[in-house]
């Protein structure tokens, strides 16, 4: 069973998600009211996961990315003010989170700073913006902000409820910019705001690589680095664990789907492994 570890309890991320969707009965107390609200939020999250605004390619990755349980774990609600860091041209999480919060909160996409010398980057930015502009009924008015790893403010300090980053930490480590980026996240969040992090999990039987050259990051190192930036660890979720991932590939984590950096070489073998073993953690700004 895939588990989510909280600071004081161990519970099943998928089981808790299913329980909320089922609207399990409890005694009529304040806890019941809270449970009902959480169940309603989770139901709305799942409606966005199942919604017609999502592309077929993104849906095909759900078995690896488990968007419903991850959002329930992060506790993103329709009223949340969410900043997603580097959502990518496909907008996997954009397709879910932007519709979820468009009426009661906001979704801001922190996208790469344009660079005319990088035509592929410029194409990706244009495709992402075109995707949003093509369906305002689903996505609402999504704001974008240019993001770089130099530690500049992303939004007005203290204005975000959530900063979410999926599979990005290794890039900032490789550039020697992780500390600056985490400091910017800390400034962006209000007191009590949450930082949600997903990253390819490195092996603990090998030395930590501060440059994350293979794309994998040791979980213990990531947690320590984020805590050093002023965050308090809240919980971890194991819904995206993958025991098939041996993390010893010729082209690092990019050997696996969806990248397949080796192209057709041993493609069936890597497809059978699936997407990487990943940790999912949440931290609060005190």
Task: Name the predicted role of every residue range.
Residues 268-286:
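C-terminal lobe and adjacent flexible extensions of AdoMet/dcAdoMet transferase-like proteins
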Residues 78-89:
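Conserved class I S-adenosyl-L-methionine
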Residues 149, 171-184:
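A short, conserved alpha-helix within the catalytic core of class I
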Residues 107-110, 192-200:
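Conserved beta-strand signature within the Rossmann-like core of class I S-adenosyl-L-methionine
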Residues 82, 163-164:
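Hydrophobic beta-strand segment of the Class I
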Residues 153-163:
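A short acidic, Gly/Pro-enriched loop at the edge of an enzyme's catalytic core
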Residues 98-99, 178-191:
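A short glycine-rich, Lys/Arg-flanked "PGG" loop and its adjoining helix->strand segment in the class I
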Residues 44-73, 77-78, 96:
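Class I SAM-dependent methyltransferase Rossmann-like catalytic core
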């Amino acid at each position: 069973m895939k588990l989510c570890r909280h600071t004081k309890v161990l519970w099943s991320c998928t089981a808790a998600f299913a329980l909320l969707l089922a609207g399990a009965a409890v005694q009529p107390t304040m806890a019941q009211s809270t449970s009902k609200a959480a169940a309603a939020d989770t139901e709305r999250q799942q409606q966005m996961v199942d919604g017609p605004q999502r592309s077929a390619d993104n849906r095909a990755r759900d078995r690896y990315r488990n968007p419903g349980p991850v959002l329930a774990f992060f506790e993103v609600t329709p009223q949340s003010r969410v900043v997603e860091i580097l959502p990518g041209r496909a907008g996997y999480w954009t397709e879910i989170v932007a519709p979820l919060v468009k009426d009661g909160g906001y979704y801001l996409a922190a996208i790469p700073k344009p660079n005319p010398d990088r035509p592929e980057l410029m194409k990706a930015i244009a495709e992402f913006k075109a995707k949003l502009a093509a369906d305002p009924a689903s996505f609402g008015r999504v704001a974008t902000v240019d993001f770089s790893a130099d530690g500049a403010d992303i939004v007005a300090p203290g204005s975000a409820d959530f900063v979410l980053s999926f599979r990005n930490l290794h890039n900032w480590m490789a550039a020697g910019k992780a500390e600056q980026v985490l400091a910017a996240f800390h400034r962006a969040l209000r007191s009590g705001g949450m930082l949600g992090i997903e990253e390819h999990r490195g092996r603990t039987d090998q030395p930590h690589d501060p440059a994350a050259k293979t794309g994998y990051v040791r979980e213990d190192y990531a947690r320590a680095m984020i805590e050093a930036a002023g965050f308090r660890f809240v919980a971890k979720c194991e819904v995206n664990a993958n025991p098939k991932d041996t993390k010893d590939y010729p082209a690092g984590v990019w050997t696996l789907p969806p990248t397949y950096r080796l192209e057709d070489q041993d493609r069936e073998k890597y497809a059978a492994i699936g997407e990487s073993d990943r940790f999912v953690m949440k931290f609060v700004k005190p």
